[in-house]
Amino acid sequence: MLTDTLHEAWTAMRYNRRSAALTMLAMAWGIATVVLLLAYGNGCAQAMINIFASFGTKTMILVPGRTSMQAGGQKAGAALRFTLDDVDLLRMNVPQISRITPEVYKSSTIQYESRTFNFGVVGDHPNVASIRVLVPAQGRFYNIEDQLQRARVAVLSSEAKEKLFSGRNAQGECIRIDGLSFEVIGVLSAKMQEGDDDINRIIYVPFTTMGDLTDIHFLDSIGFNYEVNDYQGLERAVRAVMAIQHKFNPVDRHALSVYSVMDQIRQFRGMVLGFKILLALIGTITLATGGVGLMNIMLVSVAQRTHEIGMEKALGSRQRDVFFRFLTEALTISFIGGVLGVMLAYAIAHSVGRLTLYSAMAKHAEAGDIRLLIDPGTLVIAGLILTAVALVSGMVPAIRASRLDPIEALRYE
């Protein structure tokens, strides 16, 4: 029965080749639009994941502030001051932490020959390279020996190197930081940078050497990474430990600011889901245009074959047989158009390659380049949308054909 129905649908399509071909093209363009829009949403999501990964996904930064609640006998408004004791406290009491570093920041005058700039200088332990995913593009990062020897060595971020040295080689050269000479031992790869953000203008020096530039007794922040998945539970544990040490309420967000990359990723995923739903709706509207064309073509086909339908009913064809024959014809046209549309989408995605729509708004955004990612989930969603549109578009003419009165249909010329 199904084979006969498919054969009849194929015969009808061959009889109306031009109309069927145009309808297939409309459905192909519609499904290609759906697939490409969903692929663009996937590409945006993957690009942002790459950007977050370049900063270290499982990373937290602790920044001291001022209390806004009374706790432990302390009045609100007391300032928190981090020291190296806090680093040791966290290392011993929070086993989920894998690497941790103190951090001291200073805005300094940087000189090389006749060039002078004001850049941020940061003193960290050598493991900051792993914590913040600092990848040298040239040379190396400072190590534990440099730290122990208080070596005056510096690692330049990409934009700092360009401003100081332009296209010249920086490795092995000496720069002056607040009048003190430092040897450049490495240059970092560029990171994602929005607007006037200075992440690519920072200069890194060993934490002990930073003591030659400023007081390192009190820390500006503490950074660490971890391996567990429950980052919210880890944040609560960190707040509890620090609250006991500094006598503040653990829920006081003003006393201790915790910046978590995973928390930003969670918020971003919600935004991406809404974005992908919007793109799917736009694609569905485009595909629905092809569905309207399919419905019109099928209605014309019903009108042209009214006498034929009456003859079949007179010979014993049931109402449901006529209904399924026209519905199968509509689904066949949609299926062939869908296959052509997916092939078109793959061809466009392959030829376009990388899109730099996001990069155009940011500096050094190689990680933010967008690829059109067509995954199995995209094809499943597109297939479901195509099936829904095809069913809605095909049922109207199928119902009309199945309800034709055979006597009236036989009279139709």
Spans of features found by a protein language model:
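A short amphipathic helical element positioned immediately N-terminal to and/or at the very start
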Residues: L2-R14, D86, L90
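Peri-transmembrane interface segments
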Residues: G223, E235, N249-G283
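Short cytosolic juxtamembrane segments of multi-pass membrane proteins
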Residues: T3-H7, A398-E413
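Mid-to-C-terminal secondary-structure elements
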Residues: P126-Y142, D146, A151-N249
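Transmembrane alpha-helical interface segments in multi-pass membrane proteins
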Residues: T5, R14, R18-A26, T33, ...
